UniProtKB/Swiss-Prot annotation:
The lineage of its organism: Bacteria, Pseudomonadati, Myxococcota, Polyangia, Polyangiales. InterPro entries: 4Fe4S_Fe-S-bd, 4Fe4S_Fe_S_CS, 7Fe_ferredoxin, RnfB_subfamily. Keywords: 4Fe-4S, Electron transport, Iron, Iron-sulfur, Metal-binding, Transport. The keyword Iron-sulfur applies. It holds the Pfam family Fer4. [4Fe-4S] cluster 2 binds at residues 21, 59, 62, 65. This is Ferredoxin Fdx8.
Length: 107
């Protein structure tokens, strides 16, 4: 099982969880340093619809990220609230799409 980032992260993208991950499995559409340069007052607008994601294939379930998340967005997959179950698939799809983008074109 892996950890999942859910709705409280959307448009927040707080990166406090990133440096505590021992396997570097937390990523997003923007790099953590890019996010940190966005002024706090502009984040909701500039990060609308964006969030961070945990790679379910790399996560070692140590829980370090869950304890560090200031918005309470990270859950053990088995403890994900019912209203946020869709985020399990959203997290996995982010990494599937990313792998497809990086795969060399077949000829």
């Amino acid at each position: 099982m892996a950890y999942v980032i859910a709705e409280p992260c959307v448009a927040t993208c707080d990166t406090a969880c990133v440096p505590v991950c021992p396997v570097d499995c937390i990523h997003g559409p923007l790099a953590a340093d890019e996010i940190s340069r966005i002024p706090e007052g502009e984040r909701k607008t500039r990060l609308a619809g964006l969030q961070l994601y945990i790679d379910p294939e790399s996560c070692i379930c140590c829980g370090a990220c869950e304890n560090e998340c200031p918005v309470g967005a990270i859950f053990d997959e088995d403890e994900l609230p019912a209203e946020w179950q869709r985020y399990r698939e959203i997290n996995a799809r982010f990494f599937d799409d990313r792998a497809k983008e990086r795969a060399p074109e077949e000829t």
